[in-house]
Amino acid sequence: MINFSSLLRIVKSLKTTQWQILAGPILILMILSMMVLPLAPFVLDVFFTFNIALSIIILLVSMFTRHTLEFTAFPTILLFSTLLRLALNVASTRVIFLRGHTGTNSAGRVIESFGHFLVGGNFAIGIVVFIILVIINFIVITKGASRIAEVGARFILDAMPGKQMAIDADLNAGLIGEEKAKKRRIKITQEADFYGSMDGASKFVRGDAIAGILIMVINIFGGLIIGLIQHHMFLNKAVEVYTLLTIGDGLVAQIPALVISTAAGVIVTRVSSNQNVGEQMASQLFYNPQVILLSAIVLGVLGLVPGMPNIIFLVFTVLLFILSWWLYEKKYDLENDFIKSNKKYKFIHDAISEASWNDVELEDPIRIEIGYKLTPMTDINKKGDLLDRIRIVRKKVAQEIGFLPPLVRIKNNMHLSGNSYRIFIKGVEVGQGKCFYGRFMAIHSGRETESLPFEKVYEPTFGLSGYWIDEEFKNKAQKKGYSVIESSVVLSTHLNFLITNHIDDLFGRQEAQQLLERVTIDHPKLTEDLIPNTINLTIFHKILRNLLLEHVPIRDMRTILETLSEHADTQKDPNELTSIVRIALRKIIIQKLFNQNNIIEIIGLEPNLERLLLNSLKSGTDTIEPNLSENLLIQTKEAIKKQLLIGSPLVLLVRHSLRYFLSKFLRQNFPELTVLSQFEIIDVKEIKMTNIIGTS
C-alpha cells in the first residue's frame, strides 16, 4: 500500500533542497556521460543549444559586471564550458562516425544547419571560415586575454604589500574599523586569486582551439575511411557528407568558444567602476562633441573620393554631424545649469546673514539616524510606535540603573540606505543595523523545526540569526517555533543594549545634579550634610560614574549617601570611595550577577600571581611587566571560555587591594568580565572556584 505521508515528506524535502549546490556536480556528471554514452541526434541538438545559450549568458554577464570581483566564478565557468564543448565534440564525432552514412541529418539538425546555412553547403568555404574563427580565437582574443591576466596578476601581487600596509595605516589611524579592514584584505586576496586563475584558465581555451583543429582533421579523414571502406560510399558522396558534418560540428563548437573568449577578454580588460562596459564605452567615446565633429568631416572627405560608396559614407557623415550637434547641445545645457546654480548660490550666499552662536549645533547625547524607508516608524498617524518604544527604553533604564538617560533625538539621513539606521552617543557611532518597516523579524529560538523561505539575516543586538518576514508569514513562523518581533522592537532593543553598555558616558555633571535634586526630595538631610560640605559635586559625580562604568546600579542612593557621609571626612580619593561604596552595595552586586543562587561559581587568581601583581602595585608604577601582562591576558581569555562553557557568570574574585587595578586593566580587553573583591562576597554562603588564572 502506498504511504502518501512519506511521499508528501519526500516532495516537501525536495522543495527545501538547495539545488544550486548540486549544479556543479550535475554538470560534471553530464559532461562525463556525454563522453562515454552514445547520444541520440535530438539529445545532441539539446546540448548544442544549451552550449550556445550558456556562452551568450556568460558574455552578457561579463558585459554588465561593474567590478571584476562580481564574477569571481568566471575561471571555473570557463573550465566547465571548455569541458562541455570537448564532450560535445566527442559525442558528435561518435554520432558522425556511426550514422554519417545515412545523410547530413544524421548528427542532428543543429550541426546540419550550421553546415548548410552558415557556409552555404560549400565545405571549402566552411573549412576556411572554421580556420579563421580558430585563428581569431586562438591567436588574437585568447592570447591577448591571457597576457593581460598574467600581467594583471603580477602587478596585483607586487602591489599587495603596499595595499596591506595602507590598510594597516588606515586602521591604526582610526579611519576604518576592523571589519572594513578585514573586508579590504579579503578583496585584495580575491583579486590576486582571480587574475591568477584567469591566467591559467585561458590556457584551457587555447588548448580547446588546438583540439578543435585536430578533431576536424580526424573527423574528415576518419569519416572518409569509414564511409568508403565500411559503408562502400562513393568518394564524392563521402566527401560531401562527412566534410559537411565535420564543418558543422566544428562551427557549432567554435562560435560559442569565440563568444566565451570574448567574455574573458571583456572581464580582464575592463577597469572597475560603477558603470558596466556599455555605459563606460558610451560615456567615454561620446564625451567630446568636437571629436565626433572631426570624425564626420574626415568621413565626409572620404565619401567624396571617386570610386568610394559615396551614399553610405555620406549617410554616416550626416549621422555623425547630428550626434555631434546633440552632444554639443547636451553639454551646453549642463554648463548653463551649472552657471545658473552658481548664480543662485551666490545670490543665496549674499543673502545669508553673518554667522552667530545660533549657528553652532551642539552634539546630541543620544541620536538615531534613520533611512527614508524607516520614517513611518516615527509617524503616529501611520501607526508608527518607535517613539513609544524609545520612551519605554528610557523608563526601563531609569528603573534598572537609577538615573534618567538623556532624550533621544531621531534624525532623517538621506545618505543612508532606505532601511538602515545608525545610533550615536555623544557624536560617536556605537551601533548600526537594518530594519524593514511593516515586516517582522523571526529569530531562531532553538525550538524551530524548519527554515523559512527568506534571506537569512542577523539581528543587530546579539547577532542571533533569523529572517525578515512578511506579516502573512507571522503565524506560520510562530507555529514553527520562531520568536517573532516587530521592526520597532528590533531597533529599540538595540538602543537599550547600547545605552546600557555606554551608560557611564551618558552620566554627566548635569545628570548628577538632577539626581541629587531628586534624592533631596526624599532625603534632604543626607544631601545637605554631604554636598557640598563634605565632598563637592565633581567627586560625587566621579564616584557614581565609576559605579556605572562597572554596571553597578545606583538606585540605592540612600546607602550610597550614608556610606559617603561616613567615610568622606577621612578619604577624598574618588576611586577609594568607590571601592567603599561597592562594599556597601555588595548585596545588589551579587544579586545582579548570580540572582538568588546560594553557590556562586567564579574565577580565581593563583597566590603566586597575586603576589607578583601586589609587588607591581607596591612599586608605585601601576603597570604590569610585559611578559606577565601577556600571560595574564591569555589565561583570562581561556578562563572566560571555560566559564561560558559551564554557563556561569563571568566573574573574577581577587584581593581588595587588587580589585580596582585589575578591573581597569582587564576592562580594555574583556569588558564583559566583572572583577569582585573578597569584601564584596562576605554574605555568600558557598563559593566554588571553577577556573584558576596562574602564572603559566
From Swiss-Prot:
Which residues span the membrane? 24-44, 45-65, 71-91, 121-141, 209-229, 247-267, 281-301, 302-322
Q: Which GO terms describe its biological process?
A: bacterial-type flagellum assembly; protein secretion
Give the main localization category: membrane
Q: Which GO CC terms are listed, alphabetically?
A: plasma membrane
Which key words are in the record?
Bacterial flagellum biogenesis, Bacterial flagellum protein export, Cell membrane, Membrane, Protein transport, Transmembrane, Transmembrane helix, Transport
Cysteine disulfide partners in this protein: none
Record-linked InterPro entries? FHIPEP_1 (IPR042194), FHIPEP_3 (IPR042193), FHIPEP_4 (IPR042196), FHIPEP_CS (IPR025505), FlhA (IPR006301), T3SS_FHIPEP (IPR001712)
The places in or outside the cell where this protein is found are: Cell membrane
What topology does the record note for this protein and the membrane? Multi-pass membrane protein
The family annotation for this protein states: Belongs to the FHIPEP (flagella/HR/invasion proteins export pore) family.
PANTHER family reported in the protein's UniProt record: FLAGELLAR BIOSYNTHESIS PROTEIN FLHA-RELATED, FLAGELLAR EXPORT PROTEIN, MEMBRANE FLHA SUBUNIT-RELATED
What is the protein's known function? Required for formation of the rod structure of the flagellar apparatus. Together with FliI and FliH, may constitute the export apparatus of flagellin.
Q: What is this protein called?
A: Flagellar biosynthesis protein FlhA
In its UniProt entry, the species of origin is given as Buchnera aphidicola subsp. Acyrthosiphon pisum (strain APS) (Acyrthosiphon pisum symbiotic bacterium)
Protein's gene: flhA
